[in-house]
Amino acid sequence: ATYYGNGLYCNKQKHYTWVDWNKASREIGKITVNGWVQH
């Protein structure tokens, strides 16, 4: 599986994508704290 950030993983062999919500909520929280300026 490939990890794309924000809790998102994709499995190319099996053609499915899933989200690790523990990771996602932490990373989204960091983005919120840092603001959207970096993007």
Curated annotation (Swiss-Prot):
Thermostable, activity is retained after incubation at 100 degrees Celsius for 15 minutes. GO terms for biological process: defense response to bacterium; killing of cells of another organism. GO terms for cellular component: extracellular region. It is found in: Secreted. The keyword Oxidoreductase does not apply. InterPro entries: Bacteriocin_IIa, Bacteriocin_IIa_dom_sf. Gene3D superfamilies: 1.20.5.130. Keywords: Antibiotic, Antimicrobial, Bacteriocin, Secreted. Antimicrobial activity is lost upon treatment with beta-chymotrypsin, proteinase K and papain, but not when treated with lysozyme or lipase. Belongs to the bacteriocin class IIA/YGNGV family. This is Bacteriocin SRCAM 602. The lineage of its organism: Bacteria, Bacillati, Bacillota, Bacilli, Bacillales.
